[in-house]
Structure formats: C-alpha cells, structure tokens
Amino acid sequence: MRPNQTFKPLTLTIFSAFALSAGTLTFAQNADNDVVQLGNIVVSATGSEQLVEDAPASITVISREDLEKKSYGDVTDMLMDVPGVNITGGGSSSDISIRGMAPAYTMLLIDGRRQNTRETRPNSDNSGIEQGWLPPLQAIERIEVIRGPMSSLYGSDAMGGVVNIITRKVPVEWTGSVRNELTLQEDSDSGNIYSSNLYLGGPIIKDKLGVQIFGQKFYRQEDKILQGFANQDKTSGSIKFAFTPNQDHDITAELARSIQERNTTPGKSSAATDRFGNPNEASNVSYYQTRYALGHVGRWGDLTTDTYLQHSKTDNPSRNMFLKNSEFDTKWSLPLGSHLLTAGFHYQNEKLRDLGNHFGSDIQKLSRYQWALFAEDEWLLTDDFALTGGLRMTRDENYGSHWTPRLYGVWHMTDNLTLKGGVSTGFKAPNLRHSVADWGQATGGAGGNAVIIGNPNLKPEKSFSQELSFLWDSRAGFNAGLTLFNTQFKDKITEERVCDSTGSASCTIIPGGHAFDFISTRFNVDKAVMRGVEATASWQALDNLKFSANYTYTYSRQKSGPFEGRALNKTPKHMINASVDWDPNEDLNLWTRINFRGKTSEYQSRTSMADGTASYAFVDLGVNYKVNRNVDVGLGVYNIFDKRVTNEDYGGTYDGRRYWLQLTANF
C-alpha cells in the first residue's frame, strides 16, 4: 500500500483547516500549528483540496518561490516553462494556448472565479488583454495549470484547460513588501519596461478581521518595430477584507480596479500607411475594469460549503463597448465513507452594450444568461485506486441544455509509480455577437471596410478528450512523467467569406445599403483532432541543486471543412523547456533556462491558410541575492544569444537581449 494513503483522515483534516478555494482563506495559519502543508496541495482539479499526485487531472503547480526568481510582465511570462502550454501572438498580443487549442478555449480563474472579458474587444477574440486583469506578482501564492478540458467542473470556455491564480491569504501579523523591476533593452528599437508592485496585509481585529491590499504599476515604452510591442501602461489595485466570526465561517469582501492603456504610433509599432496607401492614425485604446466579490466558506461538521457572488464591469470606451458580468457559484463537499462528494450550482449573466454594429440595424445591446448544476464523486475503491466521476448540466438561454461528463482514475501502482487516465468532454457556447443575425462586426484591420455577420444557426463547439499518464517519484529527489493525450474537436466555428468585392463590384448589406470590401460570417463546419505527448523530469541532485526539463509533441489535423488535412492552429510540433537552479548558500540563488519552440506547419488563420514558421530558442540566466532579512535583489540577462524573432518571419515579435534588475523590500 502506498504510504500516507489515508483518504478520509486527510480529507477531514484538509476540510477542517482550509476552504475549498485557497483565495477565500481568511487568515494564514501559524507555522507551528498542526495543519496540512500546502506545498503539494491543489484545488483546481476537483474544486476541493488534494495532493497533486492524487488529483484527477494533468496539473502543474508554479510556486511563489519560483515566481519570485524571474521577470514577469504578466501571467504569460509565468507559464513559459509549463509542458503543453504555448504562448502565442508575441508583441502586445501574447496569449495562452494549451495542448494545441486556441487561447479562447483557456479559462482564466482568480481563486476559482472566472475572468472573461473577451467580449470587450473587436470580434471578441483579440489577444493580449485578458491576462492584464490578473493579479500582480506580489499578490500570487501559486498558479495551478490544468491541461485538458474541465467543462464538467467549470463549464463553457474550459475546453482547452484552466489557469487558476491562487492569491495570498490574509496574514495573522502585519507584513508588506514593495517590488520594483527594470528591464533595459540592448536594442534601442525595443521599449524598456518598468514595474512596481505593492503588498500590505494584516489584522484589524486579532483573529477576527483582517485586510489585504495589492497594487501594481506597469509601463512599457513603444517599440520602433513594425508589429512590435505597443506602449503599455497598466495600473491596478485591490483591497480584500476577511472576517472570521468563529472557526466555522470565513467571509471575504473584495474590490479591484484595473486600467490598461495601449498606444501605437504609425511608423513605430504600427505601419505608417494602411493597405490602400493612406496615412494611418495613432491608436490610443483604454480598458477599464471594476470587480466586486463576496465570498463565504462554511464548515458544518464534515460538510464544507464555498459560495461566492461576483460582479465585474469592463469598458472599452475607445470602441464603445461595455460589458457587465454577474456570477453566483456555490459548492458543497462532503466526505462520506470512501467517497468525497461535491455538488454545486452556478449562474452567470452577461450584458454587452456595443455601439459598433455595422449591419444597419439599431441593435446595440446583447445579453445572455446561463445556469448549471454539477456533481462529482471521488470514490476510493481501494487504498491505492480512486475513481472520479463528474457530470455538469448547463442550461444556456440561447443554446438549451448541454451535458458534460468526465471519468478519471488514479492508481498508485507502487510507492513510486502512479498511473492516471480518463476521458472528459468540453463545450463552448458561441460569443454574444456571433449568433445575432442583425449584427455586423467591423473587421479588415486599420483602414479596412469589411464586416462579419452573425449567424443564429451556430451550435456550441464540443470536444471529447482522453489522456493517460505514468508518473514516477523515486521519493529520493527524482520525478518523471509521461502523458499521452488525444482530443477530438467537433463543430468548430470557422469564419468564411460570403462576398469578396473585385474590380468595381461591391458587397452591399440590406438594410443600410452600405458597400463593403468583403462580408464574412461564421459556420459550424470543422472537425479536428489534436494529440500529443508530454514528458517531464525533475532531479534534486543535491539539497541546493535542481535540474528540470519537459518536452511536448503536438499534432493537429482538420478532419473536415475547406482546409481538411491541414494543421488547425499555429502550434509548434516540438517544445522543450529546461532549467537549472542552484543555491550556493542560503542567501544566493543562480538559475538558467532554455525555451525551445519548434517549427510550425501551415495553419488556419481565419479564412485562409498561413505559412508555417521556423524554430527558435531563448536562453536566460539570472541571480537572486538576499542582502538581509528585509531586502532582496535580482539580476538577469534574457535572450542571452540575442535571437531575433519578428512578426515578418515568425508571425509575432519577441524581445532580443535585455537586462533585468529587481529590488524587493519586505517589512
């Protein structure tokens, strides 16, 4: 029997000490309290806390200790080393793709709460903004990344995977920190980066009421590189109150405000003229978000409940787009004999006001509600084998009911070897604009005169995935894993041209009578398959020396539609990440890493196939030094060999050699 395989005692300990979501924990435990340590515990795989090796999913955890060692502009930088994850876009449009699925299928969570504002961008799919709403580095306790569909637990948008940002708990004693970072580019055409993060937290009334404050300022100068980084200015802050009336109840109230500004100048990061030869104008775009949240965790004997109410308002005034999202979610978890039962209810309501309808109708407001019931049972059939079954029924105002089941097994074959595997389903409802017949969304880029018409006959996209994992833990510092995955994608929504003007011909919309260069709409036409391999290894060679590496192979093919037999997305076939971490003494840390991205084949880019791109690799090196108990410094050289990756050659722009400096003061 595997050591420490005590399902019910461990479960009871966890549920008596912690909330279902780490972000709603009220006060951090004292170091000498007899509690389960969080180092190997995750919450995203089932909504309940469990050891990583027991979690019914392929999951990667990035600890706070690892996050503090390197330079991060946003969460995309934090995920560079995760197997199966590809950071797409480049420049100011970086986004997160998991196992070959487009970024729109990756769900972003903060403490298990959805963050979805893609509707506030033109065509609802522009990248690079979504992660700007996530907490700053100083606010993060850890990041949990689930690779593969999780719609049975999280609903629509979790078809590709989940990134869950777990924030820090309110401390029992007053503490704080200020972290300042500077990145200087060797190439004067690339913009320098400045950022500052603030954290402050502590008790107002001992053991009853606490407060936590986060703040961030991020600024990047504009590149003088076509399709390079825009001028970016981000300001965000949040305040959270945590109230513990007694040991059985935790109540939180949170307010967060974020502002993102992006500016491009013709002749710098944007083209001097449009495709017709007319001078381009400078682009100044601002996004504003305000988010309110109330949370409650209750412990009622063996039963634990986790409930939250969240409302967010996101504005894109430069494009006259305004989005309101309201959500209510409750989970109930109960260990019962050899079962861990979880059930819950979720409700969300989206309201979009967009003044950019080019169809000629007077429609400006779109809305949709969705509710869901879900249940899971983690059943410990033997001391070494657990089977998790889950089912979610989602009722969408526009698309009716959808059932998303999953079944996953975890077998600890020996003390060292674990076999995991299962099947899961996913679905994603079309975006609000996509299915409205009288909606015409502007497209065609700067100076363009084109429109995409909504299609009321669209169906939700669906997926069916299988995976199998072998995990080896020597219990002496060496870990390795091999995962095989296969995803069948059905009813993919594809954009198609229905009219393309040539010569003196024109495409005219009735009503309105406006002539466009081209008119597109969307259809459910495509089937696709994504499959691959993820291999990982980690070796703690000495107490102060660690080697880590992972490799991902991804294959994708469209099985139907006009591009049958071609690759689906711009995903490298081969990806390799490797790192070395060395602590010569308790105050000094040295690290280096390499990120390799293999070539991509031709891939579908909206209505046509785009050329594949060549391979590239980045090598980084850094050092962190603890000056004293209150001051830390970090130095780094990124892209040591100055590999140039430009939009012209690679379809995205990444920085060349640059130098990083950070100073953190703790108090």
Tell where the protein language model's regions lie, with residue ranges.
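Conserved C-terminal beta-signal and adjacent last beta-strands/turns
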Residues: 6-7, 13-15, 28, 201-203, ...
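Extracytoplasmic beta-strand/coil segments of soluble accessory domains associated
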Residues: 39, 76-117, 141
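N-terminal periplasmic accessory domains that precede
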Residues: 75-78, 94-97, 108-111, 130-133, ...
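Short acidic/polar hinge/loop motifs at secondary-structure boundaries
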Residues: 115-147
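Periplasmic-side early beta-strands and strand-to-turn transitions of outer-membrane beta-barrels
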Residues: 171-285
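Gram-negative outer-membrane beta-barrel transporters
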Residues: 179, 380-387, 486-488, 508-604, ...
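Outer membrane beta-barrel strand-and-loop segments of large Gram-negative receptors
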Residues: 325-334, 338, 344, 366, ...
